[in-house]
């Protein structure tokens, strides 16, 4: 015992026991003492055997599960060895995935002491959270969406093609009605259509605007010929009424393709009206210029004639005066 106590006394100098006091003790000590102290160092009597029991290296704590593994090569090798030694592969592959929880014995020497989930369940959870499955599902959904879009696009294309085909057919029929020859089935329909065209031409002629010069020149003719003036006095409304009455009687001629011809005739008549008005204006200008030139020529001729007459009269008077003077 004496030798053991001597050993303890020799070890006392090597070890220092540091004790941290509480806040209340510090307040009491500061009140009792003049100078404040935060820490207090005391020497404790410890034996080497007790030191061996209390202190343990980090590897032992790691094996007991009291320390987390550090990311260092030796510790990683230890973890790999522990995982290789721990046999749970047979249990995992022997049981199906859809079964319930499998209780596996966990020893105190393994670092899985804090885990309450079995390895099979952990693998199942990891398989449920596998990103490849989610990518496959996402790709399948994308393919379905693409198929739906393709079906819609094909439907739209077919609808566009059908609408374009109908438009092209309608335009072809319309153009054929312009350039095709109109075939009259009945003589009465042909005669009525010809009479209608003649009436339209007469209406367009009556509705034409005549230039100013032609109106001046044609005034005495209209006054002399009462029949012509009566025909020109026909109003546009009367002609339109007659045209409406004839169009109601000639519905069969419209079905044979006379509408495009009437449209063409109206367009040509409108263009001819514009040309006639332009030509009438040009003629009016020319006629006014010619009249002015004639008036100038006539005035010059009159002036020359008057001058010549006055000169001849003056000469005759002079001759008579000279004769009287010689006689007297």
UniProtKB/Swiss-Prot annotation:
UniProtKB keywords: Cell membrane, Membrane
Record localization: Cell membrane
Extent of Polar residues compositional bias: 223-240
InterPro entries, A to Z: BKI1/MAKR1/3/4
Region (Disordered): 213-253
Sample GO molecular function, one term: kinase inhibitor activity
UniProt key word Hydrolase: no
Cellular component terms (Gene Ontology): plasma membrane; plasmodesma
Main location group: membrane
PANTHER family xrefs: MEMBRANE-ASSOCIATED KINASE REGULATOR 4-RELATED (PTHR33312:SF5)
Protein name in UniProt: Probable membrane-associated kinase regulator 4
Annotated source species: Arabidopsis thaliana (Mouse-ear cress)
